């Protein structure tokens, strides 16, 4: 069997090649996700051989589709960046921690020993930061002692928090 790093590199190639518009080289945007897509997103990466651990701490998010979509898109971009720029990743941890009026998304990846990080244009990080800013939030990204971390904080008025949608909970 292929080594996990080879599988991840192959998945990266297939994902970017298949998604690219041949005329522009751009990857098209997908339609808005349906219910349960954050958990489904993680499952798709796991099925493709990416070693993802997913956890949720706290209550569900409010039933605000924009907030849910923002969290989903930031997670999607962070995980896709792992495929693009860290194909030898040994482990990925996706954690959502829900507090009063705040959700914190953390995506950590551990690089294989001796791997060299690849650098992108930074446009994905800009997009994540712009999405988070709509919800009074922030996105920080940078190296850790073992790999790379993306941390997004989203905020909302707790008085509007109904917390009725369990879409983002792990399956």
Where are the predicted features?
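Glycine-rich ATP/GTP-binding catalytic cores of kinases/NTPases
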Residues: 1-171
């Amino acid at each position: 069997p292929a080594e996990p790093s080879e599988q991840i590199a192959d998945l990266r190639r297939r994902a970017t090649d298949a998604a690219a518009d041949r005329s522009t080289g751009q990857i098209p945007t997908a339609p808005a996700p349906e219910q349960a897509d954050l958990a489904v997103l993680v499952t798709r990466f796991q099925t493709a051989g990416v070693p993802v651990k997913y956890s949720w701490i706290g209550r569900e998010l409010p039933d605000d589709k924009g907030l849910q979509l923002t969290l989903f898109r930031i997670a999607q971009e962070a995980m896709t960046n792992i495929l693009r720029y860290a194909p030898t990743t040994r482990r990925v941890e996706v954690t959502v921690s829900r507090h009063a009026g705040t959700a914190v998304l953390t995506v950590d990846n551990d690089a294989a020993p001796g791997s060299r990080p690849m650098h992108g244009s930074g446009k994905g990080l800009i997009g994540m930061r712009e999405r988070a800013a709509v919800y009074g939030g922030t996105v920080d990204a940078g190296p850790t002692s073992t790999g790379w971390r993306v941390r997004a904080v989203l905020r909302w008025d707790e008085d509007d928090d109904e917390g009725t949608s369990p879409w983002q909970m792990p399956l």
